[in-house]
Amino acid sequence: SVIYSWDHLHKLHKSSKSSARENLIRRMTNYQDITGERVVIVFDGKGQTSESINDEYGIQVFYSKSGTTAYQIIERLAGKYSKNRKITVASRDRAVLDTCSSFGADAISPKTLEELLEQAERDLRKRMV
């Protein structure tokens, strides 16, 4: 849902889904590098027979299997890890945010995530001057 919520990614997605995903992965990798916060991205796998996990640019990227949604994986991960770690979930789906929040995760909108990313990028530029 982040791809559909960020204008530049949504436009890119219309011409190339893989490019939009790649762009999101790279920007979130930068966020992880700047902030030191671990990033995990979950995508719908579009008919894959098994769930896959790739380590792309130093972050975990999950692709759901056929019959499972990215939202289900997000909820499962939040339920499993939010007891022991600070988890932040970004989604435009209110039900997903409510479920993850009930597990103890912080729940934010894609717009808030974009603002956090842009702030981290500004902070990095200031440090480099």
Please provide the spans of the model-predicted regions.
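Nuclease catalytic cores that cleave nucleic-acid phosphodiester bonds
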Residues: S1-V129
